[in-house]
């Protein structure tokens, strides 16, 4: 019987249905234009892009250009890829353009959908970023969809790790740039550590389309991107402490699996104090509760978490002697990603790996704050409605369910719950054997590498052929996914490994054709293609007759969304399929989040071994438990964002000021304003307002003026003069400091001085910001304890971080003023020494090339294109070039990037 809500929905339609219906007239308009665009030749499509671009630049709204742009893009895709976009794909593209999340089921062609809003927004010339979850997809999509953009007369670029700077800048300068979320975030941080605007890669944050948006903006929201530098080596301490942890008994600590925290009990602390003292780690007479013991306590707690919370082959693997983290949501390895605050080092000690030095944060940003930089943000995923509240609350993004092109034919079974893990796995193996016998391909979803390999062993014992896709086999990922839809295939995958690649019934035709051509290179490729297409059609039909892809999940995830993603691998584009979840009361989710009630009920029912309970209300009960977990995780992310927003406001100020300085030709006025502020603070400190002359610290001010301003004035005599007050003292100090810096500028030359001021200011900003980040990290780690004193930790953090920020700015002004006052031109001897060092560095960098080019010749003739009389060792022969002029050595580089660095 339908409830009132269901009846109302059937009569009036849901809000989502009404939203989709509202754009149907625009889609009809695009369809009406199709014959007109089909009549264009290839040059006509490119000319249409030029026309639309001019109209956009002349102020015509993109919404008004949308029908023509979408019609042009559809025709280009039809010609370049042989794919004609369905109406539902146009609807998805339209909502992306409007800054929404388009929820589109697996196999509905999200990659093609992204080209429509990307093309439309690319007309402005301000750049569009299409964001994917891994480098493979970024490169694949840029090459694949790049054909469409080329047909439209637009440029496409791809950004990837360790890409040469020049190539990266060119990629960002394209109309459409494909990149991973990680690389975009890191490039943003790197750009804000550059020395000049010309060195920056990104050119702004205009419009972004985020593929698998739930994975990036929800799952990874709590993970900050950090650029870090090494700090002191404490590997001996990690190893020493790691030897103590195996001695710890269960009553010495408490473990909270929900929050993944481990803490020592009072009894455990007593045991630790005794053991650490005996081992010589804790100095004699020192207690764990002493302030001096903070570092040791931090390391011991990390070691406990490494042993009791983090499990090998689940959260990480050991490969080539290194601890490599595994993404808990995708099952993929994350090389290069490290846990912070010494936790990674603790795991390295546990596994006996080489301990890498701890790092200090140089710059950081969370995805939550990075993606909020964009003027317009859109996203695509197969599952977003369960997190619609979070998308709306944090990112201001609405979620629109896009209808499928064909009705979903997949059968979704109710969950089967067993008493024990053994019973569950026995049933799974039996079910896989039945499906395999009739030729139905099976995709088995597991939650960890360990469990995927354990299930693999069970299938081997049962003589069932299978493939395993986890972090260890990531190189074969594309091949394994391509074969997963073949007749009788059995594929075990961790969570969502292979996400982003469709599992096609009968296997991936293109892969099969490439393999056949490679196996017989002398044969006619067209003949092979025709033969393979016929064979594939037969195989595809056989798989459909066997029931399509069977997705069999071995556990429920904390998030319903991850479960829905796994389920969505089956039944793409109206194909038949089936999905089942096999659970046990020993599963992590069931155990942690209360399986006691269910266990009692199963006892009451008198269930026998091997029997399962299968009922819709079990599904409802589990979904309620998952919804609770999702709500708790959302609250954590929301609270973390409030803390990060405090730092984000400060980050925007610092990065904004830094960019202004990089873009300014002359910052002499900025340097003078800083110096004047330092002088005012100095006078306030040593000649406090409303005080008499005999209360002034004139000797302290004289010393401060010498140290900070580089000037020596008879300040001690000012106290005896009539009419000298704060204002007069400030004027005298400012005048003397201005004269001193003017004389210094004359020695260096105006252009050189401006360059020095800029470099000193940028370097000092970076140094102070790094120190400030470290201070904020420490504040963040302790401010939670203020709650015990009935004080709001967030308000305390806001207040103190603002005070720390002001203190950082004061320190910045003082340091810049002092550095500029102390800097001196190089003597000829120092210049020669610097030259020798540079020659050594150049030789080391150039290697054999440097030796070959030198060829035993003298300095003068080593530069055949140099200006007349040029001698490398004698700057007086260089002709006084400007920083942006060509270098006099004839290298073709700008002076500032060549010999100008010596100045």
Curated annotation (Swiss-Prot):
Reactions listed under catalytic activity: ATP + H2O + cellular proteinSide 1 = ADP + phosphate + cellular proteinSide 2
Gene Ontology molecular function: ATP binding; metal ion binding; protein-exporting ATPase activity
Membrane topology summary: Peripheral membrane protein
GO CC terms: cell envelope Sec protein transport complex; cytosol; plasma membrane
Main location: membrane
GO annotation, biological process: intracellular protein transmembrane transport; protein import; protein targeting; protein transport by the Sec complex
Function text: Part of the Sec protein translocase complex. Interacts with the SecYEG preprotein conducting channel. Has a central role in coupling the hydrolysis of ATP to the transfer of proteins into and across the cell membrane, serving both as a receptor for the preprotein-SecB complex and as an ATP-driven molecular motor driving the stepwise translocation of polypeptide chains across the membrane.
Name under which the protein is recorded: Protein translocase subunit SecA
Native source organism of the sequence: Jannaschia sp. (strain CCS1)
Lineage of the organism: Bacteria, Pseudomonadati, Pseudomonadota, Alphaproteobacteria, Rhodobacterales
């Amino acid at each position: 019987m339908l409830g009132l809500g269901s009846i109302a929905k059937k009569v009036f339609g849901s809000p989502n249905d009404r939203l989709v219906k509202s754009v149907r007239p625009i889609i009809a308009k695009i369809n009406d234009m199709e014959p007109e665009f089909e009549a264009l030749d290839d040059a006509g499509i490119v000319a249409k892009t030029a026309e639309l671009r001019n109209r956009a630049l002349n102020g015509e709204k993109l919404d008004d250009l949308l029908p023509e742009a979408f019609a042009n893009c559809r025709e280009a895709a039809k010609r370049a890829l042989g794919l004609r976009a369905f109406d539902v794909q146009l609807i998805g593209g339209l909502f992306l353009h409007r800054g929404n999340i388009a929820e589109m089921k697996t196999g509905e062609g999200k990659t093609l959908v992204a080209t429509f809003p990307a093309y439309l927004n690319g007309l402005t010339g301000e750049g569009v970023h299409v964001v994917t979850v891994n480098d493979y997809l970024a490169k694949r999509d840029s090459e694949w969809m790049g054909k469409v953009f080329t047909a439209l007369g637009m440029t496409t670029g791809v950004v990837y790790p360790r890409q040469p700077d020049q190539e990266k800048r060119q990629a960002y300068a394209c109309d459409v740039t494909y990149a991973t979320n990680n690389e975009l975030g890191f490039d943003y941080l790197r750009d804000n550590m550059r020395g000049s605007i010309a060195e920056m890669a990104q050119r702004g944050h205009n419009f972004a389309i985020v593929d698998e948006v739930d994975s990036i903006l929800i799952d990874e929201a709590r993970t900050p991107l950090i650029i870090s530098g090494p700090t002191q080596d404490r590997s001996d301490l990690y190893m020493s402490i790691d030897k103590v942890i195996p001695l710890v008994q269960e009553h010495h600590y408490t473990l909270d699996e929900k929050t993944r925290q481990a803490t020592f009990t009072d009894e455990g602390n007593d045991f630790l104090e005794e053991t650490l003292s005996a081992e010589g780690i804790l100095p004699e007479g020192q207690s764990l509760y002493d302030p001096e013991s903070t570092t040791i306590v931090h390391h011991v707690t990390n070691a406990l978490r490494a042993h009791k919370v983090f499990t090998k082959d689940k959260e990480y693997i050991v490969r080539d002697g290194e601890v490599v983290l595994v993404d808990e949501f995708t099952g993929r390895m994350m090389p290069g990603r490290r846990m912070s605050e010494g936790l990674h080092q603790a795991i390295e000690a546990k596994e006996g790996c080489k301990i890498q030095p701890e790092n200090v944060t140089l710059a950081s940003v969370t995805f939550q704050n990075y993606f909020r930089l964009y003027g317009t943000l859109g996203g695509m995923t197969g599952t977003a409605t369960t997190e619609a509240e979070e998308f709306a609350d944090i990112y201001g993004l609405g979620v629109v369910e896009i209808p499928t092109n064909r009705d979903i034919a997949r059968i979704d079974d109710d969950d089967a719950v067993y008493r024990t893990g053994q019973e569950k796995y026995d049933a799974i193996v039996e079910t896989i054997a039945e499906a395999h016998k009739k030729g139905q391909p099976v995709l088995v979803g597991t939650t960890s590498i360990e469990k995927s390999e354990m299930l693999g062993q069970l299938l081997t014992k049962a003589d069932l052929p299978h493939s395993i896709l986890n972090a260890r086999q990531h190189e074969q990922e594309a091949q394994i996914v391509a074969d997963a839809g073949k007749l009788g295939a059995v594929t075990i995958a961790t969570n969502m490994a292979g996400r982003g690649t469709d599992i096609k019934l009968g296997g991936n035709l293109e892969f099969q054709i490439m393999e056949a051509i490679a196996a017989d290179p002398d044969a006619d490729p067209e003949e092979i293609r025709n033969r393979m297409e016929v064979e594939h059609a037969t195989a595809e039909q056989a798989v459909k007759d066997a029931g399509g892809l069977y997705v069999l999940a071995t556990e429920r995830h904390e998030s319903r969304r991850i479960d829905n993603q796994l389920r969505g691998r089956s039944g793409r584009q109206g194909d038949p399929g089936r999905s089942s979840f096999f659970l046990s009361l020993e599963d992590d989710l069931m155990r942690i989040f209360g399986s006691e009630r269910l266990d009692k009920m199963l006892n009451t029912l008198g269930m026998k071994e091997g029997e399962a309970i299968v009922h819709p209300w079990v599904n409802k009960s589990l979904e309620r438990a998952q919804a609770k977990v999702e709500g708790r995780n959302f609250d954590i992310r929301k609270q973390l964002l409030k803390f990060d927003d405090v730092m984000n406001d400060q980050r925007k100020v610092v990065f904004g000021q830094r960019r202004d300085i990089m873009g300014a030709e002359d910052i002499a006025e900025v340097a003078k304003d800083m110096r004047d502020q330092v002088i005012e603070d100095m006078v306030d400190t040593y000649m406090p307002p409303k005080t008499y002359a005999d209360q002034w610290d004139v000797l302290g001010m004289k010393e401060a003026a010498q140290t900070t301003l580089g000037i020596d004035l008879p300040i001690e005599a000012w106290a005896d003069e009539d009419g000298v007050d704060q204002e007069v003292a400030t004027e005298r100090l400012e005048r003397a400091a201005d004269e001193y810096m003017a004389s210094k500028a004359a020695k260096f030359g105006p252009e050189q001085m401006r360059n020095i001021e800029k470099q000193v200011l940028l370097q000092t900003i970076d140094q102070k910001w790094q120190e400030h980040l470290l201070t904020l990290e420490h504040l963040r780690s302790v401010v939670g304890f203020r709650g015990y004193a009935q004080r709001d930790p967030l308000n305390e953090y806001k207040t103190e971080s603002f005070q720390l920020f002001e203190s950082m700015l004061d320190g910045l002004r003082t340091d810049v003023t002092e550095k500029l006052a102390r800097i001196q031109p190089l003597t000829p001897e120092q210049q020669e020494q610097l030259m020798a060092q540079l020659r050594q560095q150049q030789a080391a960098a150039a290697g054999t090339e440097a030796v070959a080019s030198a060829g035993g010749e003298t300095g003068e003739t080593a530069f055949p294109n140099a200006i007349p009389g040029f001698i490398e060792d004698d700057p007086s022969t260089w002709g006084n070039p400007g920083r942006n002029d060509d270098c006099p050595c004839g290298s073709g580089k700008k002076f500032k990037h060549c010999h100008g660095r010596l100045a």
